Amino acid sequence: MKKLTVAISAVAASVLMAMSAQAAEIYNKDSNKLDLYGKVNAKHYFSSNDADDGDTTYARLGFKGETQINDQLTGFGQWEYEFKGNRAESQGSSKDKTRLAFAGLKFGDYGSIDYGRNYGVAYDIGAWTDVLPEFGGDTWTQTDVFMTQRATGVATYRNNDFFGLVDGLNFAAQYQGKNDRSDFDNYTEGNGDGFGFSATYEYEGFGIGATYAKSDRTDTQVNAGKVLPEVFASGKNAEVWAAGLKYDANNIYLATTYSETQNMTVFADHFVANKAQNFEAVAQYQFDFGLRPSVAYLQSKGKDLGVWGDQDLVKYVDVGATYYFNKNMSTFVDYKINLLDKNDFTKALGVSTDDIVAVGLVYQF
C-alpha cells in the first residue's frame, strides 16, 4: 500500500495524457497507399504484488496498405508488432510478438473478406468498454482465447452500412481454423474449428450491438477438465454471447457490456471456468483542454467451479485519466482498485487481490 500512496502522490504532482494520432503516409501513388504507424508507451506499475510491480514499457510498429484494383475492388493488408522495452539486452526478444498480420479484399458496398491474425468478431462488442487508460477489457475478452480478442487463423467477412443501404448498420461473420497448442504453458490459447457473428447499429452517437461465437475445444483442454474439474472446464465446446450499449457524442463516452461464456474464460493465467458471467461499464468525458477522466467497473463471476462453487474471478473499480498534449503526445494514470477478497479460493489458485497504479507517457504517430 505504501507503494500505491507514493505513486498517487507522484502522479498528482504531474498532469496526465494521449489522443488518437494519424498514421504517417509514406507512399501514395498509382492507386497504391501505404501508412506507417507506431507508439512508444513508457510506463510503470506500482503494486504490492511483485508480479504486477515494475517497468512495463513497450513499443509498437505497424503498417496499413491498400491498392485499388478497379472501381469496385480494393486489396488491403495490415501488420503490427510489439517490442518489449523492459527486458535486458541479454534476454533477447522472446517476449516480442506479432499482434496483427492479415490481408484481404474489399468489394465496394458488398463488404470485405480477409484472413490472418486479426481481431475476433466477439471483440466488436468487447472493444466498447476496452477504452481505459491502461487496464480494462479483461473480464471476457482475452488475447488468443478463441474469438474474443486478437486471434490466429481467422477468416472474416465484414459489411458496413448494410450493403450501403442503412447507415450505421454493420455485421460480420468469422471462421477460425484449428490451432492445437498442447503445452501446459499455452494450452488455453489453443482452439478447434469455430465460427462467430456480430451486428452493431449506431445512430447519432448511440450504439447497440450483440455477438455470438462457438468453437470446438482441443483434446488437451477437454482432458485437463477431466483430471481437475474444479479449475479446468471439461466441455467439448467453448461459447460466448455478449450484448452492449454505448453513447459517444458531445465529449461524453458511456458504454456497458454483458456477456456469458462457457468453457472459455481464463483466470489466474492457466485455469478455465465452466461458466462465467461478465459485466463491464465505463464513463469518460473529454475536456477541450485535453484532459479525459475515466471511471469504470468490471466484474467476472465464475459459476460451478467444482468444490469452489461460484467465485468472483475479476472485480474492480478503475479510476484514471489521460491528458493529451497534442495528437502525438499524452500521459496517463490509472488506478485499479481490486475488490476481490483474500479467501481460500484466491490463495489456492494465485488470484491477485492487490491494487495496481499505472503511470505512463506515450508518443504515437
UniProtKB/Swiss-Prot annotation:
Subunit structure: Homotrimer.
GO terms for cellular component: cell outer membrane; pore complex
Phylogenetic placement of the source organism: Bacteria, Pseudomonadati, Pseudomonadota, Gammaproteobacteria, Enterobacterales
Cell compartments where the protein resides: Cell outer membrane
Classification via NCBIfam families: PRK10554.1
GO annotation terms (biological process): monoatomic ion transmembrane transport
Keywords: Cell outer membrane, Ion transport, Membrane, Porin, Signal, Transmembrane, Transmembrane beta strand, Transport
Record's protein name: Putative outer membrane porin protein NmpC
Similarity comment: Belongs to the Gram-negative porin family.
Keyword Transport: yes
Signal peptide: 1-23
Superkingdom to which the source organism belongs: Bacteria
